[in-house]
From Swiss-Prot:
This is UPF0435 protein SAHV_1865. The lineage of its organism: Bacteria, Bacillati, Bacillota, Bacilli, Bacillales. It holds the Pfam family DUF1128. It comes from the Bacteria. Belongs to the UPF0435 family. It comes from Staphylococcus aureus (strain Mu3 / ATCC 700698).
Length: 68
């Protein structure tokens, strides 16, 4: 079964170890572009560790997908 956008955001949020988890509210990604979100999810899951610049880039990309 495929993951929902919300489940992907939860997994990304956990992997990024975001202190303020409210910044990545899964509800705001319900209608996000599924393909782009899946690309981010796949990248994050493929990495054992993420550099600070990667975390920043991922957060920026997620911010562009969010629907407030």
């Amino acid at each position: 079964m495929a993951m929902t956008n919300e489940e992907k955001v939860l997994a990304i949020r956990e992997k990024l170890n975001i202190v303020n988890q409210g910044l990545l509210d899964p509800e705001k990604y319900k209608n996000a572009n599924e393909e782009e979100l899946t690309d981010i999810y796949d990248f994050v899951q493929s990495r054992e560790r993420l550099s600070p610049s990667e975390v920043t880039a991922i957060a920026d990309a997620l911010g562009q997908l969010r629907h407030d």
